């Protein structure tokens, strides 16, 4: 289920918009994740106390973590499918330390698509959305495969 060169170009063009403000985009993605799926907040001891969207927007720690998440994802996307080492490392930490279920990766993928569309509607049309969805699905499938190797059934 690889992406074509054209699809990767759409993904990287969209990601270029993210890179104009990685922390801001990351914060919005996490806010959308936590407000849309409050159960995900339970995996983050550092953020459990944030109960409202206003509290989340005011949290510098949430913004920093959003930057970390999207910086890691951007590094993976830029590898255009050749990211085995990065995914293996990420899967190990997310399975063994953080215990993040694959379902939560689906939730954050949806949040990424929505934030990109909300912030950049003219640059993130149907073709770009489809390509990004495909790239994120590829990433999730590889994370799930690594989880299986690690014996994590999240």
Swiss-Prot record:
<keyword id="KW-0597">Phosphoprotein</keyword>
<keyword id="KW-0813">Transport</keyword>
<comment type="similarity">
    <text>Belongs to the globin family.</text>
</comment>
<dbReference type="GO" id="GO:0015671">
    <property type="term" value="P:oxygen transport"/>
</dbReference>
<feature type="binding site">
    <location>
        <position position="65"/>
    </location>
    <ligand>
        <name>nitrite</name>
    </ligand>
</feature>
<dbReference type="GO" id="GO:0019430">
    <property type="term" value="P:removal of superoxide radicals"/>
</dbReference>
<dbReference type="GO" id="GO:0016528">
    <property type="term" value="C:sarcoplasm"/>
</dbReference>
<dbReference type="GO" id="GO:0005344">
    <property type="term" value="F:oxygen carrier activity"/>
</dbReference>
<dbReference type="GO" id="GO:0070062">
    <property type="term" value="C:extracellular exosome"/>
</dbReference>
<feature type="binding site">
    <location>
        <position position="65"/>
    </location>
    <ligand>
        <name>O2</name>
    </ligand>
</feature>
<keyword id="KW-0408">Iron</keyword>
<keyword id="KW-0561">Oxygen transport</keyword>
<dbReference type="InterPro" id="IPR000971">
    <property type="entry name" value="Globin"/>
</dbReference>
<feature type="domain" description="Globin">
    <location>
        <begin position="2"/>
        <end position="148"/>
    </location>
</feature>
<keyword id="KW-0560">Oxidoreductase</keyword>
<dbReference type="GO" id="GO:0098809">
    <property type="term" value="F:nitrite reductase activity"/>
</dbReference>
<feature type="modified residue" description="Phosphothreonine">
    <location>
        <position position="68"/>
    </location>
</feature>
<feature type="binding site" description="proximal binding residue">
    <location>
        <position position="94"/>
    </location>
    <ligand>
        <name>heme b</name>
    </ligand>
</feature>
<dbReference type="InterPro" id="IPR009050">
    <property type="entry name" value="Globin-like_sf"/>
</dbReference>
<protein>
    <recommendedName>
        <fullName>Myoglobin</fullName>
        <ecNumber>1.7.-.-</ecNumber>
        <ecNumber>1.11.1.-</ecNumber>
    </recommendedName>
</protein>
<comment type="subunit">
    <text>Monomeric.</text>
</comment>
<dbReference type="GO" id="GO:0019825">
    <property type="term" value="F:oxygen binding"/>
</dbReference>
<keyword id="KW-0349">Heme</keyword>
<keyword id="KW-0514">Muscle protein</keyword>
<feature type="modified residue" description="Phosphoserine">
    <location>
        <position position="4"/>
    </location>
</feature>
<dbReference type="InterPro" id="IPR002335">
    <property type="entry name" value="Myoglobin"/>
</dbReference>
<dbReference type="GO" id="GO:0020037">
    <property type="term" value="F:heme binding"/>
</dbReference>
<keyword id="KW-0963">Cytoplasm</keyword>
<keyword id="KW-0479">Metal-binding</keyword>
<dbReference type="GO" id="GO:0046872">
    <property type="term" value="F:metal ion binding"/>
</dbReference>
<dbReference type="GO" id="GO:0004601">
    <property type="term" value="F:peroxidase activity"/>
</dbReference>
<comment type="function">
    <text>Monomeric heme protein which primary function is to store oxygen and facilitate its diffusion within muscle tissues. Reversibly binds oxygen through a pentacoordinated heme iron and enables its timely and efficient release as needed during periods of heightened demand. Depending on the oxidative conditions of tissues and cells, and in addition to its ability to bind oxygen, it also has a nitrite reductase activity whereby it regulates the production of bioactive nitric oxide.</text>
</comment>
<dbReference type="Pfam" id="PF00042">
    <property type="entry name" value="Globin"/>
</dbReference>
């Amino acid at each position: 289920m690889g992406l074509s060169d054209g699809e990767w170009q759409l993904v990287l063009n969209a990601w270029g918009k993210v890179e104009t403000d990685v922390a801001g985009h990351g914060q919005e993605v996490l806010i959308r994740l936590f407000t849309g799926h409050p159960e995900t907040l339970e995996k983050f001891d550092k953020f459990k106390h944030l109960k409202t969207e206003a509290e989340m927007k005011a949290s510098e720690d949430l913004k920093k973590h959003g930057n970390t998440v999207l910086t890691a994802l951007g590094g993976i996307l830029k590898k255009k499918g050749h990211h085995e080492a990065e995914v293996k490392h990420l899967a190990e930490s997310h399975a063994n330390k953080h215990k993040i279920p694959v379902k939560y990766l689906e939730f954050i993928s949806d949040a990424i698509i929505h934030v990109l569309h909300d912030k950049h509607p003219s640059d993130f049309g149907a073709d770009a959305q489809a390509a990004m969805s495909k790239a994120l699905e590829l990433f999730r499938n590889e994370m799930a495969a690594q989880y299986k190797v690690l014996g994590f059934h999240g």
